[in-house]
Amino acid sequence: MSVLNIAVSRCSPTVAFCSLVILCILFKVLTRVREDRKIRSLGKYGHQIQSKLPLGIGFLYSMVKAVRAQKNFEFWRDNIFGASGRWTVETRIMNERTIFTADPGNIKAMLATQFSDYGKGAAFHAMWKDFLGNSIFATDGERWSASRKLIRPQFTRDRLSDLQCFEAHMQTLFRVLDAGGSPLDSKHAEETPMSQGKAIDIRDLLYRFTFDVSTDFLLGQDVQSLTTPRQEFAHAFDEVQRMQTIFVRSRHFSKFMSKKSFRDSLKVMNGFIHKHVRRALSLSPQETQQKSQSGSKYTFLEAIAGFTRDPTMLRDQIVGVLLAGRDTTAATLSWALYELSRHPEAVDALRREILQTVGSDAPTYDQLKNMPYLKAVLNETLRIYPAVPYNVRIALEDTTLPHGGGPDGSEPIAVLKNTKIAYSTLILHRRRDLYPATSEKFADPAIFSPDRWLHWHPSAHDYIPFSAGPRLCTGQQFALMEMSYVLCRLFQRFERVESHMQHIDGGNPTLKADIILSPGDGVWVSFHEPKQIDSNQLL
C-alpha cells in the first residue's frame, strides 16, 4: 500500500474535509495572484464597485431587484456609475470579474477599432443556442461572417424601395383602428377620460403590425396577428422570447427552472418556420433566381435559400432577423408616438412636412428619404430610447480598453480573456456631458426635441442606436424605412394624437428592458382626424 493511501485511510472525515477546503482556498488564492499579475502587466484595474455581501451577492441582489421593478436604468445610472462619477467601473460577481462602461471610447474599441478582441463568446452562444441557433446575433468569427454575407445583400435599395408590403399591412392597421383597436383594460378603465376620444394601446397594435410585416417579408406569409391576436405562431414566438429572457437573467440558476413552456413553444415556432424552409428548398437555386427576375413576390427566405441549402442555417437566420425586425421597430414606433402625443408642436411640424412633400397619396421611397423632420423625429426617439439599451461583449483574448484604469480612470483598463464587459447605449445617449450646453438652439438633452437634429449632429460613437463597426445592424435602412412609412401614413390621416399616459405613469415612462427597450405600461393614445381638410394643404 502506498504512503498516500495509508495517509488517506488514516484521515478522519473531518480532517479530509478541512484539507479539501484548504486546497480549494489555496487554488483560488493562487488563481487570483496569477490573474492580478496578468492584469498589472496589461494595464490597470478600474474603479471597484463595493458589495455589501461577499462574492458580489449584495450587488447581484440589488441588480435583480431593480430589474424586477423595471428600474434597470436607475440602477445603472445611480448604483453603477453615479456613486463613483466614473463611466467605466468593475466588480466581481460570484468571483467573476465584470466591467461596466458607458464610455464612448471604450464602446468604440469593442465595436470597431479592437473588434477582433471582443465578441459574443461561447457562453452567450450556448445560452441562446436553442432560440437563436447560429444566427448573426449569437455567433463570432467565421460563423458570424458567413451569416452576415448571407443576409446583407437582402437589404439593398432595390429591396427597400418596394413599399407594397408596408402599404398592405398599413391598410389593415387602419381597419383595426377604425374598429376601435384594443379596448382599454379594466386596470386603467377608470383612470382614462374616455370622453377625450377612444383610447387604445398603440404599442400592442404596433407589435402585431411589425410581426405581420416581418413574416410577410421573410416568409411570404402574413400571419395576420393584427386581426388574430392569439395567432399560434406569434404567441409561441413571444413565449420563447419571454422564457429566454428569464433564463438569461437567472444565469446559473436557470438549470433548476422548468423549461416545459419554453420547449413546447419552441416546437410550435420551429414547426412553423421549417414548413416554410421546406417550401423554399423545394425550389432549385435556378428556379429561385428566375422567380426573382420574373417580378414574382420577393421573400427573404427564398432569396437566401439560393445561397445555402442547409435548413438549420436558414431557420436560424429567419429567427434572428424576425426578432430584430419585429421588436426593435415596434418599440421605436411606440416610443415615437409616446413622445409625439405629448408634443403637439412636433406633430404639427411633422404633419406639415408630410402633406407638403407627399400630399394624400402613398409615399415613395425617395419622398420618405427626403423629409428631414421625419428623420429628426426618429433620430430623437432613438437617442432617448435606443432599441437595445444594454449589451454585453466577452474578451476573446487578453486585451485592454482605452479608458477607465488607474486612480483617475484616464489609463487603459486591463481585460483578460473571457472577462465580461457590459455596456449601456441608454446611459451613453443620456450623458449630459456629451451634449452642447442648453441654449435657445439646443434644448435640454433630457427633453424630446426633434428640432435639435436640424442643426446638430452627434459624434460618431456618442450615438449608436444601430450599434457600430462591423456589427452595424444590416437591417438599419429597412427598419428606418418601415418606421418612416408608418408615421407618414398615420399623420397623413390624423392631425392629432392625444396622450392618456398622464393618468397611468404620471408622465414618467416605465423603461421596460427585456432584450428590447419598450414602454412598460403600453402607449395609450387616441387619434383625431381633421374636422375639415383644407384642399390647399394637399397641393
From Swiss-Prot:
SUPFAM superfamilies: Cytochrome P450. Its cofactor is heme. It holds the Pfam family p450. One of its GO terms (molecular function) is heme binding. GO terms for cellular component: membrane. This is Cytochrome P450 monooxygenase pvhE. InterPro entries: Cyt_P450, Cyt_P450_E_CYP52_fungi, Cyt_P450_E_grp-I, Cyt_P450_sf. Glycans are attached at residue 379. Cytochrome P450 monooxygenase; part of the gene cluster that mediates the biosynthesis of varicidin A, an antifungal natural product containing a cis-octahydrodecalin core. The PKS module of pvhA together with the enoylreductase pvhC catalyze the formation of the polyketide unit which is then conjugated to L-isoleucine by the condensation domain of the NRPS module. Activity of the Dieckmann cyclase domain (RED) of pvhA results in release of an acyclic tetramate. The cytochrome P450 monooxygenase pvhE then catalyzes the oxidation of the C21 methyl group to a to carboxylate group. The keyword Glycoprotein applies. Pathway: Secondary metabolite biosynthesis. It is found in: Membrane. Disulfide bonds: none annotated. Keywords: Glycoprotein, Heme, Iron, Membrane, Metal-binding, Monooxygenase, Oxidoreductase, Transmembrane, Transmembrane helix. Heme binds at residue 473. The gene is pvhE. The chain crosses the membrane at residues 15-31. It is a single-pass membrane protein. It comes from the Eukaryota. Signal peptide: none annotated. Its main location: membrane. Belongs to the cytochrome P450 family. Its EC number is 1.-.-.-.
